Amino acid sequence: MKRLLPIAAAIAALTTASMANRLAVPVIVGGEQDYDACGSGGTVEGLNPRGDGFLAVKAGPGVNFERIDKLYNGMQLYICGEQGDWFAIVYSQTGSWSERCNVSTPWPRAMPYTGPCRAGWVHRRWVGSLAG
């Protein structure tokens, strides 16, 4: 049993590192002393329930990046940046705004988002602005 503990710890560390490195293009948050780390919020809307019914969260701003998650109509997210038609987002697993994401307060320095919530890129066509 004692031999398995170091192995389990190493596997947990590798899993955490691989989750943090899933984004090919990091979501950058912060950089403003007087403004929230992510400047606005939105909600997923307009998805066809008879289609695939989800909005693909991508590892970067484009269709050729890996899909890393799925979002559904009504889910809320923080919009932290944009590149072309793509929003850089932070979102909680519950699909609602969460204080624990820590992006609704100022971050004086701009830096890649590493958690505790999820981050990625979504096409702006399926995001309606709610706040910000």
State each model region's role:
Residues 2-8:
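Sec-dependent signal peptide recognition
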Residues 16-20:
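Sec/Tat signal peptide C-region and signal peptidase I cleavage site
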Residues 21-42, 90-132:
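Boundary regions of SH3-family modules and the immediately adjacent low-complexity/disordered segments
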Residues 44-56:
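Short, basic/aromatic beta-hairpin or loop at an interaction surface
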Residues 59-73:
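SH3/SH3-like (including bacterial SH3b) beta-barrel domains
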Residues 84-88:
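Short aromatic-glycine-enriched beta-strand elements
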